[in-house]
């Protein structure tokens, strides 16, 4: 009898933990730069480019390319999600309001910007822990402006390093294969 109860408890615990293990991007909720809890399930069915950003980085001008990409493809079900992080040489020292002001005034960003997070180390955001452990795309975030292209099913379709410009043919050709046809 004790064995049966122990087995039942083990099954229930295993199922409970499996139910809370994220399997897609859409299983996460993140705080926006305005402090609002945003379920990423709101982007279900869209192609999503997740980018860790910084305002004082050599790659910061990529904000312009990210906005250009967003404007070009958003009517086809594409969105960019920016996740500011201060993990690399303190290149994102600003507060959330300062980050928003910088992005909207200097680069006219209209895509969603989220609250500053950590993308590495012990305090890595669960979203980035998931992104960096997915089969075929695993590996640490090595610098600002790493990009994950997520399909409409919430699974990673491609990963690009900091040096890949958002409007490069390398990224846009992969995006075109994932986006719904016109």
Question: What are these model-predicted stretches?
Answer:
Residues 19-41, 126:
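N-terminal "domain-start" segment that seeds a small globular fold
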């Amino acid at each position: 009898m004790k064995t049966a109860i122990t087995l039942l408890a083990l099954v229930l615990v295993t199922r409970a933990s499996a139910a809370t293990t994220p399997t897609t991007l859409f299983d996460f909720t993140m705080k926006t730069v305005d402090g609002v809890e945003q379920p990423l399930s709101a982007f279900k069915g869209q192609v999503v480019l997740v980018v860790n950003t910084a305002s004082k980085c050599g790659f910061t001008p990529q904000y312009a390319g990210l906005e250009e990409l967003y404007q070009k493809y958003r009517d086809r079900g594409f969105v960019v999600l920016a996740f500011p992080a201060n993990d690399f040489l303190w290149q994102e020292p600003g507060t959330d309001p300062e980050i928003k002001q910088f992005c909207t005034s200097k680069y006219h960003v209209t895509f969603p910007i989220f609250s500053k997070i950590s993308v590495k180390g012990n305090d890595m955001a669960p979203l980035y822990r998931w992104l960096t452990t997915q089969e075929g795309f695993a590996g640490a975030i090595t610098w600002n402006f790493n990009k994950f292209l997520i399909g409409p099913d919430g699974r990673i379709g491609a990963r690009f390093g900091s040096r890949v410009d958002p409007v490069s043919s390398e990224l846009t050709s992969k995006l075109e294969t994932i986006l719904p046809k016109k």
